[in-house]
Amino acid sequence: FANTPIVSSPAYDIEAMMAKYPAPEASESTLQRDVVQTWECKMRRTRVRLTKQSLVDKAVANGVKPFTALAGLLCLALRGYLGKDDIQYSYSADTRKAAGVPDALYNCVCSFQHSVKLGDGTRLADIVPEMDAAVRRTLQPEAMLRQMAQQMSWVYKVDQQKAPLRIKQRVFQMGEYISGVPADFWLSYLGNPLLPATPEIQTYTKDFNVWVPPDGGSMGVEASSLNGVITLCIENKAEMPGLAASLR
């Protein structure tokens, strides 16, 4: 029977990417870098809703992207919940367009990590200008490709080795720690808020089973926009109660 062809861009030239953006040489200090300790307790799920307009108002008042305003608010809330003054957060960027494969159906992303230092009197306006500048720098095509090359170089080198799959998996995990993936929380935005509602988005906000687990972080926060309401789908591996109250 006839099937509709699935259109996907061909694979990008990883060897050319590695040649253009060579990975820095690893040293003894690379293996000894400090890595944030993440919680690995039983997963608990929380939904938090806020109006899209309230987030936009916060962003406009501070002259930053809504994404940055949300990240800043989460950092302030999680300081009390996690009991830490230094909060590390990570996010991923879609690199398909920058890599010249806009219709790729395979995974084509890079990840960035930043940290923010907080105190008792820290306000949103104190932290979001620097956070926003960092986000804007990292989302430039050249910066995304360079980061993607550095993160893929580890995968590329390990894949070339003649070793059992279980050994490669362990080495991949070590590479994640070296590249600084672990964070207090991951933040991602699902869907395009300018497009009409889709069944997939509606299902996502209700079905825990389709949420993305927070690998490499104490919690994963996925924000989706639907009918003027932003839903935060949070999977939390920290043992402390009271996350929802902290976010309010």
Predicted regions located by residue number:
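Non-catalytic, low-complexity flexible loops and terminal extensions
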Residues: 1-58
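Amphipathic alpha-helical recognition patches that constitute DNA-binding helices
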Residues: 7-9, 13, 65, 69, ...
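Gly/Ser/Thr-rich phosphate-binding loops and adjoining beta-strand/alpha-helix segments
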Residues: 33-96, 228-230
